[in-house]
């Protein structure tokens, strides 16, 4: 338990003392704090900090579990989903304004999708928004930007298998577009081509990477 608390504390170091106290209380005694504020604080930081955006889902899951157990309510989850919906509607403007904020948002939403469960199933409300963001990332202009390609690959590794189980047709469509880009789009860097091929083979192998494939792709990336 101490190790887990230290990990959570580490993720909070970017916050001032008041916000740290808010989040620590939300994690342990969610009925005693403003959970809408806590959700917005986590979202705000996730849009600024790539590392935090990748880990925030775990914090959100912990707060949701604690709130359900202690109060039987879903205030934090509702506030979090409302904020994600607002950011989803504004995603085109976000991408135009700040590429880093955009990839942080995608990472945050995929991380929340990865962690949050209702009746042991991923949240249906997030399936199409996550897919829409991944489709944004396979557009020709996005595939010319290293940050967006890295984000695409990371999120497909993280949630691709879960997403496919929730809606196989959209995953087929996504990979059809991804394959067309790999084969037909000019101007892609050799690293992007390598990463796209890796994703195509990764899905074809049942969302698993063989040792041989891992050694090949990642020795190429490191070179």
Swiss-Prot record:
GO terms for cellular component: cytosol; nucleus. It is found in: Cytoplasm; Nucleus. GO terms for molecular function: RNA binding; translation activator activity. It comes from the Eukaryota. Keywords: Cytoplasm, Nucleus, Translation regulation. Residues 7-206 form the MIF4G domain. InterPro entries: ARM-type_fold (IPR016024), MIF4G-like_typ-3 (IPR003890), mRNA_TranslReg/HistoneTransl (IPR051367). One of its GO terms (biological process) is regulation of translational initiation. Transmembrane segments: none annotated. Functions in replication-dependent translation of histone mRNAs which differ from other eukaryotic mRNAs in that they do not end with a poly-A tail but a stem-loop. May participate in circularizing those mRNAs specifically enhancing their translation. Belongs to the MIF4GD family. Interacts with eif4g1, eif4g2 and slbp; probably tethered by SLBP to the 3'-end of mRNAs ending with the histone stem-loop, it also interacts with eif4g1 which is bound to their 5'-end. This is MIF4G domain-containing protein A. The gene is mif4gd-a.
């Amino acid at each position: 338990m101490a190790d887990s608390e230290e990990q959570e504390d580490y993720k909070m170091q970017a916050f001032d003392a008041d916000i740290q106290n808010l989040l620590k209380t939300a994690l342990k005694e969610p009925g005693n704090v403003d959970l809408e504020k806590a959700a917005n604080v986590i979202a705000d930081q996730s849009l600024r900090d790539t590392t935090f955006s990748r880990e925030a889902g775990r914090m959100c899951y912990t707060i949701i579990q604690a709130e359900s157990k202690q109060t039987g309510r879903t205030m934090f989850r509702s506030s979090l989903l409302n904020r994600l919906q607002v950011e989803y509607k504004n995603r085109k403007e976000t991408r135009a304004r700040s590429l880093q904020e955009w990839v942080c948002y995608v990472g945050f939403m995929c991380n929340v999708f990865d962690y949050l469960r209702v009746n042991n199933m991923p949240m249906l409300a997030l399936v199409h928004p996550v897919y829409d963001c991944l489709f944004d990332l396979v557009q020709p202009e996005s595939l010319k930007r290293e940050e967006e390609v890295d984000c695409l690959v990371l999120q497909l590794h993280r949630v691709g298998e879960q997403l496919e189980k929730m809606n196989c047709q959209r995953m087929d469509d996504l990979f059809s577009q991804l394959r067309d880009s790999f084969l037909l789009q000019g101007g892609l860097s050799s690293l992007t081509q390598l990463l796209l091929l890796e994703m195509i083979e990764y899905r074809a192998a049942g969302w698993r990477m063989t040792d041989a494939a891992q050694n090949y792709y990642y020795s190429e990336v490191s070179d």
